[in-house]
């Protein structure tokens, strides 16, 4: 397994393709009741999202239940009972007319999910946000294209945790861009994505991005949803191919687009949404010696958020 996964390059290969359930779904006929946690950072939520999406595309009866916690956590017994009564025992009970997505809201009991027509929320629309300079302090995250030829640089150092980087107001080891304080709640539903143009001082560099809710809640009893919205990682060497990465030319800028992990979260009034860009993540990436410089071209970097109500909702909450 250690050899097959090719940890050194990080390239997608036959080892990973053989473990991708999407490649094994063609014979599937059974109705699918999928359960997952949006903050499962072991088996990440993209797996349930991709599988349930493909099942729907195949015409398979599909229902999904998401809670806001980590690994494990089944749907309510009543929900499972209705599903198995219909699709295991063959008793007509109308479950196919029920909502297709059930999501536990941030402070609710996992046994009382909220029903939605589908996941992602059909009312979610892409909102494109641009970056405004601020490093090493905090820059802006705004709908306005600032159209500035600005570049900002961070220094990789995995000895600083992502949490510590998000909490501090000044750091050379991350770039942080935030919205204005929300005047209304804002509902994110789906897969945020980022297009980033960046350069490395060395032939390889980790790329980590977090979407966070600020100010950071430092209470020991804070829930993960109080602080982390979602996260994403990439290898800039794979900017043009997932299967055939190539060494970076130091100082040369490369453009890359990738998704964050799927999420469904309501960000509360009074918070700010922050995009944090850093390099090595002490919890999830390989950990090279500190010192690599990662430079981001702000003009050519955007983040897209799937927001329920789209630009109108974002404008009402932020502008």
Give, region by region, the residue ranges found by the protein language model.
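Extracellular/periplasmic catalytic domains that process cell-envelope and extracellular macromolecules
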Residues: 25-28, 57-58, 95, 120-123
